[in-house]
Amino acid sequence: MVAITIFAVLAAAAYGGMNSIVRAQIAVRESSDALDAISRALARFEKDLSQAYSRSARGAYGTIDAAMVGDSNSLSVTTMTIAASATGPSATPVRVRHTLAQGRWLRTQTAALDLAPNTPETARLILDDFSAVSLRYLDAQLREHDRWPPANATLEGVSPDTLPRAVELRLTSKRFGEIRRLIALSAGRQ
């Protein structure tokens, strides 16, 4: 009887220990997956900005959009993408838009740079686990702006094709707190 009681106590302790290990493993896996999702989203954003191309685009109804148009929670930019063709890879300019609102980060890309009405877009959710976001833009004189092109861009002689020197992204993750990235644009150093 004593042996059975000792065995039962040891079995209960072993079960409790195994249960704790499994719960810890699940928590680590969930944190790892969440961090991986943030890393992929930031890498996609950095890749788009590193391929920024200093060329304005024509909107669907004939409006001219600057090479980059952005505010505190969205950004549209002309980027160069590598496309496969019969003669080999070639660089093609496309328009990419990042929209960060209501805890969702969407990346939208159009197949053409100068749009016609009803040009199809490809939208993809790249992150959905954050509580706050802000974008800021750094000009050639190292001044910060909440929008790009700056409100006084025409008075300062800034061309619509001018890109900022850098873009700062501040993202508040529900799990990891504030994440801040400052991305330099090579095309912005003119």
Residue ranges and their predicted role:
Residues M1-F7:
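N-terminal signal-anchor/signal peptide hydrophobic helix marking the start
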